[in-house]
Each structure stands twice: as structure tokens, then as C-alpha cells.
Regions:
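Intrinsically disordered, low-complexity sequence elements enriched in Ser/Thr/Gly/Pro
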Residues: 5-7, 25, 89, 276, ...
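A surface/secretory-pathway sequence property marking extracellular, secreted
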Residues: 78-108, 225-263, 389-416
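Bacterial N-terminal signal peptides that target proteins for export
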Residues: 2-14
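Helix-centric, low-specificity signal for extended rod-like, repetitive segments
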Residues: 1-2, 20
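N-terminal small/polar-rich segments of proteins
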Residues: 26-84, 114-239, 271, 279-399, ...
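Bacterial N-terminal signal peptides
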Residues: 14-22
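Extracellular adhesion/glycan-binding regions together with long Ser/Thr-
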Residues: 97-125, 250-280, 412-436
Length: 471
């Protein structure tokens, strides 16, 4: 009898204990579904991140309703000093209790205020919710954002929103950035010559710097546009300047190219912007007029391979894979020639006895101005058959009375006697910009006596033509 009574008491005690456990299990343990990844694809498309049917607890829904609030004020970034996100960035909606949909499902933005997101019966079961994160209108920084999410059935302290670190190019730099030199005015100008804008576009969740360098060599390679035995001096990459700009103007300071990476961006880099897209960044390459004049006189193609690197700023302490892109700056100097005569009227006057006895000379400083990007010859000829008296066309003086030669100190000029046939005064001159020739026109005394003395008084005129031609 005593043994049976003890068994009954033990059974009763066990039943009461089980009942107590059921009654007091009102708030359960938080499930592991306490994180959302805001993927690159969503940020790029500016589409919502959806995470459905996330179990938050296995519990009896006390009072028949599911509520949520946050004991945090913001979603804080894991790196100190970085901007936070508002709690409302995360949207939450009650979903199911067990296999049954919650009633009165309501999506709410997370806030410090307790809000009902669904109702249901007092059944011991899994409770699930849907999460939604709109990506539009938010600047997403790589890293982890945390805030407390407090349900009346479970706590997520903290809840995580993770943003991957990425730099993804959205445009491909062209194989070459052409700079075309097809005018002597470019050599004479201060500005020189520039490339068209080279567009850079990329998406990113990290602050970025854009570096540029000469890829493999500190000098341009050169392919001449003419056949010559000339020795060409290599042109340094340092004559090439690059500037980064956006639609509002320059983004950083100009850099000179070398084989060392130099930043096109300000020291602090470029911040992540709304939409996380960096379009409309343009690189302009420039060579100043003085550098063109000193280094790019020879016609041909000057080529400098370059490398762009887009990387995270050193101060942003989350790793991101850098993006490199190769291009080439191609400077094409056209085959060009030009010749001009600043002084177009030359007078040799026979007004005294000594003019007839000693001859006459007219010296003209800067008589010829010439430019050529290829080797050249300069020829001279008369455009008329003789010097003709302006008052009497039958009165003439032979062309060959006149010698054209360089003034004292002027080198490289071959003297000629004027005729109607082209005669070369400069042979195979090297490419040059704005070379000035100091010439003199001379009628020696011997020619005066043989061809001029005794002629009718008056002005005798002839046209003289200077021509620049390829050798």
C-alpha cells in the first residue's frame, strides 16, 4: 500500500511540472535568421531586397498578436565615423504561425515604437516574418549595419544588414586616347593639344581613388611618318598631363604621367554617391604648346600605354578588389608644311654714283618664315621672265642680275642667281616650327655695268616665289 501511494504522488508532481513549463514559455529564443545581405545586383538595379518566411521563434503567440520595435535609434555602421542608416530602412511584415498565415498582416518600417505586424491564435508553433529593404534613395557603404530588432516573442540583438565591397566597371576605356596635331597653331598656342574625353564609369560601395600611370615605359614609342636617317630623341611621358572631371568641372588636380601611380582624384578620394553609380567621369590628356614645340615636331605616331586603377581609399578599412584598365595615348602629328613672307616688297635703289660702282644690297631680317613636320627643301624662282619697267613694258633687266643669299650669320642657305626655274636654297632641312630665314638680295657691280647701266630710269619689277617641298 505504501509503495503504490508514492508512485501516485510522483506522477502527480510530474504532471504539474510539465504544465508549468507550457504556461511560462511565452517568449522563445531568437532564430538564426537575423541577417540580410544587400546584394550588388539589388543595389545596381535599385531593386528591393526581399527575404521571406524567416522564422523568428518557436513559441506560443501570447495575446494573439505579433509586435515589433527597436531599442536602437539607427542602423550603425561597423566602421567608426561612417554614416548610419535610419531604422526604417528595414521593413517587416508578419507572415505565418505554423502553416497558417497570420491575420492582419501589416508591413511596417522598423522604429522605436512598438507596432503590430500580424495577429493569430494562441498556438505553440513557429512564427515567421518577411523582410524587405528598398535600396533606392540610400547610399550603401560596404560593411555591416546593426540595430536591435525586438519582437514581443523574440529579440534579435543585433540584427545585421551586410553590404558587400565591390568596384565594378560599367564602361570600358577605349584602346587609345587620340591626340591629333594637324595645325601649326597648336604648336604656337599655350594650350597645345588635348584628347577627347575618355569616359570612366563604375559602380561601387567603397570610397574610391583613381590612379593613372605610364604602363611599362617612361617614354613614348615613335613611328615616323616619313623616311629619314634622322635620330629621334625619346619623348618623356612627363610632358603628358591628365585631368579627371565630371559634368561640374575638374575633380582633382592635373597630374604628369610617369611609371608610378598618381592619383587623378583628391587626397580624400571620391565618396560613394546615391545609386552607388559613378558615371560621367572623364579623363582629358593634354600636351602644352611649349612641350609640343620641344618634343613633337616630327610627323608620325607617338604612343604611350597607360593603366588606370580604381581602388578603395586607404582610410576605408574594408577590403575591395581593385579594378585596372589599360589604354594608350596616341599622339598623331600630321605631315604638314607652311611658308610665309612677312615682308613682301623689297626695294633696291640706284640713286647714287656709288650704287652703280659698288652694286646694291637689300638685307631683310625674317624674310621667310617656314614650318614643316617632315624634311623639306626651299626653292626660289621668278614669276616673271625679267625685271620689267613699270612705265615701259619693253624696257627690261635680266633676272640673273640678282643674287639671293643668306645674310651674314645665316647658315644653311645656298646662294642662287634668280631665274624662272626653281632653285634650291635649303636642301633636306630637318622638321622645324617657325624657322626664320634672314636673306639678302644683291646686285653686284659687275652686273650693274653689264645689264643695268644705261637703262631707262624707272621702277623695274619682278615677282619672286618661295616654295617649300619634300626633298
Amino acid at each position: 500500500m505504501t509503495l503504490k501511494l508514492l508512485k501516485k504522488k510522483l506522477y502527480t508532481a510530474l504532471s504539474l511540472l510539465a504544465c508549468c513549463l507550457t504556461v511560462f514559455s511565452v517568449k522563445g529564443q531568437a532564430n538564426a535568421n537575423n541577417a540580410i545581405t544587400v546584394a550588388e545586383a539589388n543595389i545596381t538595379a535599385q531593386s528591393d531586397v526581399i527575404s521571406e518566411d524567416q522564422v523568428i521563434a518557436v513559441v506560443l503567440l501570447a495575446g494573439g498578436k505579433l509586435t515589433v520595435k527597436s531599442t536602437s535609434s539607427v542602423f550603425s555602421h561597423n566602421l567608426a565615423g561612417q554614416p548610419s542608416l535610419s531604422l526604417g530602412t528595414l521593413r517587416i511584415k508578419g507572415k505565418n504561425i505554423g502553416s497558417t498565415a497570420l491575420s492582419a498582416q501589416t508591413e511596417v518600417p522598423l522604429s522605436p515604437l512598438e507596432q503590430t505586424i500580424g495577429t493569430g491564435g494562441a498556438v505553440l508553433a513557429t512564427i515567421s516574418v518577411d523582410y524587405r529593404v528598398p535600396t533606392g534613395g540610400t547610399i550603401w557603404l560596404a560593411g555591416t549595419y546593426t540595430a536591435n530588432v525586438n519582437y514581443n516573442v523574440a529579440n534579435f540583438t543585433p540584427f545585421y544588414m551586410t553590404v558587400p565591397a565591390y568596384i565594378t566597371a560599367t564602361s570600358v576605356v577605349p584602346a587609345s586616347a587620340p591626340i591629333t596635331i594637324n595645325s601649326f597653331g597648336q604648336f604656337r598656342s599655350v594650350a597645345g593639344a588635348s584628347s577627347n574625353n575618355i569616359s570612366l564609369g563604375y559602380n561601387t560601395t567603397v570610397p574610391t581613388v583613381i590612379d593613372l600611370k605610364a604602363k611599362t615605359s617612361s617614354t613614348f614609342t615613335f613611328t615616323p611618318g616619313f623616311t629619314s636617317s634622322l635620330t629621334f630623341t625619346p619623348v618623356s611621358s612627363s610632358v603628358l598631363k591628365a585631368t579627371l572631371s565630371d559634368p561640374t568641372g575638374p575633380v582633382g588636380s592635373p597630374i604628369t604621367l610617369s611609371t608610378t601611380d598618381k592619383s587623378l582624384t583628391p587626397p580624400a578620394g571620391l565618396p560613394v554617391i546615391l545609386t552607388n553609380k559613378r558615371p560621367s567621369l572623364n579623363t582629358v590628356f593634354n600636351i602644352a604648346g611649349a612641350d609640343l614645340l620641344a618634343n613633337f615636331v616630327n610627323a608620325g605616331i607617338y604612343k604611350l600605354p597607360v593603366t588606370y586603377t580604381i581602388a578603395k581609399t586607404p582610410a576605408f578599412n574594408i577590403a575591395a578588389t581593385s579594378k585596372t584598365m589599360d589604354s594608350s595615348v596616341d599622339v598623331t602629328v600630321a605631315n604638314m608644311m607652311d611658308i610665309s613672307l612677312p615682308t613682301t616688297t623689297i626695294a633696291l635703289n640706284f640713286t647714287s654714283q656709288s650704287n652703280y660702282s659698288s652694286g646694291v644690297t637689300a638685307a631683310v631680317t625674317d624674310q621667310v618664315m617656314l614650318s614643316s613636320t617632315v624634311p623639306y627643301n626651299i626653292t626660289v624662282k621668278a614669276g616673271t621672265s625679267a625685271f620689267v619697267n613699270a612705265s615701259d613694258a619693253t624696257a627690261t633687266i635680266p633676272l640673273n642680275v640678282m643674287t639671293i643669299e643668306g645674310m651674314s650669320g645665316q647658315s644653311g642657305i645656298t646662294p642662287i642667281q634668280l631665274s624662272t626655274s626653281p632653285q634650291t636654297i635649303i636642301t633636306n632641312g630637318n622638321p622645324v616650327i617657325d624657322r626664320k630665314l634672314n636673306l639678302q638680295y644683291r646686285i653686284p657691280s659687275a652686273k650693274v655695268l653689264s645689264a643695268i647701266f644705261g637703262k631707262s630710269p624707272g621702277n623695274y619689277n619682278a615677282t619672286i616665289i618661295y616654295t617649300i617641298v619634300a626633298p
